[in-house]
Amino acid sequence: METFQESGADVVVPDDSHAVLIGVSAYEDAEFRPIRAARRSVEAMRALLTDPVLCGWPPDRVTEIVNPSLAVDVATGLVDLAEKTTGALLVYYAGHGVLSPRAELCLTVTSTRWNRPKITGLTWETVAEVLRSSSARVRLAILDCCFAGQAIEALTDSCGPQNHSG
């Protein structure tokens, strides 16, 4: 376990922790407006995570994926990383979130088609399954997109009734 100390505060990053920061700012389908802030959000999150005073993640444990073309490539990369992570696993997404015709959350990639989000985007269910199946002690997802609240409903539905307070 790595510990950083500065200004009297200890920041502890569990061994074998990984963060995946996904930002999608450009789209092939004209129905999606570009989100220039998505790229900047990934850069800001990386700076926050790797700051030794704030979070202290080693830079080699923070992976940026900016403007991925295919959802399958993102999903495969997430699975590969999740399988070897036993510390903390953080997945951050900034981009468009859209709903399928059955109200399932889909995270867009550059090639996502507005009228076919479930088969051209990255479904939240896929990301949730990656998180559930990981042996990481801490699993965290941060979604900066429309319809992010659907992720809570999907987890609640798949894990049974839960008490959410706040």
Model-derived features with residue positions:
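Boundary/activation segment at the start of structured domains
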Residues: 1-106
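Caspase-like (clan CD) cysteine peptidase catalytic core
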Residues: 16, 71-157
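Short, intrinsically disordered, charge-balanced linker/junction segments flanking boundaries
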Residues: 160-166
